[in-house]
Swiss-Prot record:
Top-level taxonomic group: Eukaryota
Lineage: Eukaryota, Fungi, Dikarya, Basidiomycota, Agaricomycotina
Extracellular side: 1-66, 160-350, 456-646
Annotated region (Disordered), positions in chain: 1-31, 796-835, 874-908, 949-1020, 1057-1076
Cytoplasmic domain ranges by topology: 88-138, 372-432, 668-1076
Annotated TM spans: 67-87, 139-159, 351-371, 433-455, 647-667
Family: Belongs to the PRM1 family.
Polar residues composition bias: residue spans: 874-886
Keywords tagged on the record: Cell membrane, Conjugation, Glycoprotein, Membrane, Transmembrane, Transmembrane helix
Keyword Transferase found: no
UniProt biased composition (Basic and acidic residues): 997-1010
PANTHER family named among the record's database cross-references: PLASMA MEMBRANE FUSION PROTEIN PRM1
Keyword Protease: no
Protein name according to UniProt: Plasma membrane fusion protein PRM1
Amino acid sequence: MSYPQAPSKFVNPDEIIPLSPPTKPPFAQYAASPLPATPHTPYSPPSPSRLSETIPLRPYLSLLPRILLTFFSPCLLPMILTIAHLIQNRSSTASLATSLKSSVLSACSGLAKGAASIKTLPRYLAMQTNQEAIRATQASILAIGTMLMDAITIIEVVVNFIVDTYRSLLLCTIELAVRGTLEILISAVQTISDAVTDTLNSVRSNIQDDIGDANDIIQTAVSAINRVTTLVNLNISVPEFSIPALSFLQNVTIPTTFEDGLITLNSSLPTLTDLKKKMDEIIDTPFEALISEINSTRLEMAASFNSSILSVPSLSSLSANSAKDLSNDLCSDLDTSLIDDTAKALHKLSSIAIGLMFLLLFLIWAALAVWEWRKWKLMKDTVDAVNEEWDRDGKSDAWRMVAIVEHPVLERYSGTFLGKIAKMPRTRTNLRWFLSYLAHPTCLALLFISLFGFLSIQFQLVALNALKAHAQSSANSTVTASTNSLVTKLNAAALNSSQEYADSYNEAIAGYQDRINNELFGSWVNTTAITLNSTLVEFYDEVEKALNASFGGTILYNPINTFMYCILGSKITNLEKGLTWISEHAFVDLPTFPSDILLLSNDSMNEIATPIAAAAVGSGDGGDDDDGVVGTLISHFESALKVERTFYGIMLGVWLALFLIGLAVVIWNSGGRENFMALRGVPSSSSPPGYGPPESKHPRWKAWLTNNHPIYDSYAEKQFRGTTPTNCLESYTHADVPNVNNGNDDHEKSFFKMRDSHAAGPFGSHATSAVRSTIASLAAPGQSFLKLSGRKLTDTTTPYDDKVPLAPVQTSEKYSRDHANSPFPRPSSESSESSAAQPFWVDKFYGAFEGVKSFFPTRSQRLGAALARKASQRTEGSFGASQVPTARTPGHDWIGGHQCPPEKKAEPEWSMVDPRMLGRALEDDKGRYPRVLPPSEMAAANYNPHPVYPRPMSRAPTLGEGMVIPSTTSHPDPFQDMPPLPPKHKRASMDYVEEYESSHSRSSREDSRHGGVTSPASSSVSYFAAEPQLVSASKVQVGVAQKGGQATRALAEIVKELQEKRERKDPFGDDYERGL
């Protein structure tokens, strides 16, 4: 059975230097060399082929499975769901359109049934109309009869008046003619009697002739009257005048008998009274008979005109077949095109949206595939870099690896971006956390689902609003056309019944109209008017004949004839014209019904049909509740979209809530907690135990005056004045020194820490390392002053202050370099009091003034220093050029036993630097110059403090060996060569935090990266690890007690460097600040 071979370690061919020895220990551990770096050649050996090897599965997903899973990425799932919703809405819209058309047809069928009822409406309208028509017609017949009777009565009176006028005129004419003539004759006889006798003969003959003529006239008149009275069977006889012989007149005078005869004739003329009575009877009898006949006729006609002669429409239109036929007629061509057009527009809108969503889905999937490939490549390169760094540094950080695996792209590209927008490491760390929070799959899925869904629904609503506006604009014309169609069809359905009814009614009215014209007006016109006209004409003819017979041939004929025409002839002529007009217009025209008598008017039909048409296609007024089935269709589609938009809006609101929560967390951890605690006056509890602000009895702005401030280091380095005891440590508990390469450091640059190029060698920059150390020590008072005044260069504490608490050892320094890292309570600097309550500006100003004033020793301090110098004595324990021992005060100079000084007012005193570097143990059995153990060994060996002599302020000790303090930098041995950095062309840093910002100046940070070579007065790292030691007169051995290699420098360089340090100006002067 063969076991799979473990895959060989992959070697990047770009990192192989051809023609160079193999990288084996110890060369692989060295990064510093006096020679320049060996250049890379373009030659790269080919990598071994792996085509024949079988690649087994890994416990992680490779690129192909990741690309396969992008089909169901959280970015694509919302689009797939949205497409499914669009398809479902499209199908539901089509089905809804079909159901709405069915609803319209059903409504039309209901309208047909209603129209069938409307079709029967003429029957009931005809019945009511018949009643009113009968009543009106009967009243008209009675009124016409009454009018005729009144007219006949009037005509009768007028005819009587005319006949009486004619009669009286005739009698007056006769009276005038006969009596006048007789009067003339009588007068003439009397005249003739007085005349000559001879003329009597002629007179007698004339008289006889005249009498004969008069007899003829009378007889003629009587004959004419008798012709008139024959109508009433009346005959008038007038005797004739006898013609006398008048023989006696011959030769006789006129006798009186002639005159008497004339007078008798005159008195015997007729008066025509009988004629008047006969004329009245002739006229009155026919008129009375005519009035009676008209009256009876009108009553009989009015009574016979009733509902029996008028027909009404039948109820046969209520049958089912008629309703079905009417439904087919009304609904066969009903306009439902607007519903179809709207459904097609919605379907087209949904199809376009679905197509665009599919296209967008494909594009996003392609982008996700490219993104996944890029993320996989970046993660693979990052893992390779992390593996190389772990192999080189021997450290690991699993949480950094988690961040890389979760968000490799953020880890790769966020460092540069965050470095531009945020200068504080804590802010960059918080922003990196915020980006990881937002890039979590849950947040991403929620964002993409809500955002894509909301935008797609909103775009559809915008298009739907345009479609809705178009549908509303065309609704008015559709409603008008539908209403006109329905009105026309409804009127056509009722027109037949109305036509039948109107025809039957008009026929009945025509029959009665004929009866009225023939029976009422016909008898009167034919009987009365014509007869009366004939009678008048005949009467006037007879009168003329009588006048002609009486006065014809006489001088009175023409005047009498003219007189008769004026009085009687013109009246008879006008009466004839009147009777002729009555005969021509003696008829009536009764009103008839039109064919649409039973149809509703257009306004009424519109009132009936408009709500039905509006229910089918909408009223077109744009109202929310009156859009008809088209509005229902659009509202259904719109309501479904609005519900989905609300759902996606809620999801987007949830994502915004999560965004605000994450932003609040970032703000809270970026200074919000400290500001909140400061406002409440409560100290922040976020600092680690033992690193919070101390409970000091002095004001906070005077804290730097205590014996724990690095200002005393500068004074001790410039003016050495003996020793005073440090604070008593009653009990000591060993504090483990943690690994200086702590990978979980919050202020670490990235998941791997790129070293500075100067840190590769044991000394870095040979000419400037000590200078930078001294600059860092001199900058410490300025830093403290800025902290004191409430201003600080950075709010980030150094890793040496926060993460590397060293074990306290005995020292005679006023301020030990281990004090900042002590696990015991200490006065907190401004960097550790960021969350404490800020002082008022008055306190700040007063503290700053007092702090500047305290930079310089007071007069009492200078006098005390002078007295101390005079009190010093030389002993054999002294060394160096001065041979001045330390001024001792029993119980105060040495640490040990139970001697603890009482609390004193903080005053500046001069002390030496840390005595652990080089000191002389006077009471040790192992010799004058015993070897001082490291701190860890001193703590484990029950180290007892021993008195030592302080050394002068000389950088060149007199011993060839001495105590070496372990380095507190990120590497155990500052002289050990570090592995080479990764090539720049392979990858860039995945950092999201820029280079570490300490609370000290820029020079102090640079010194911390160069093996920890700093000034003894610096409180951050150890200077003594690289302290030069005298070996011979011309050489100085450096780093004797280190495990790594060693190096030497010329003594002249050391002396020159020390001389530069001595000649350096006051660190508190302006020149020094300009030099920085």
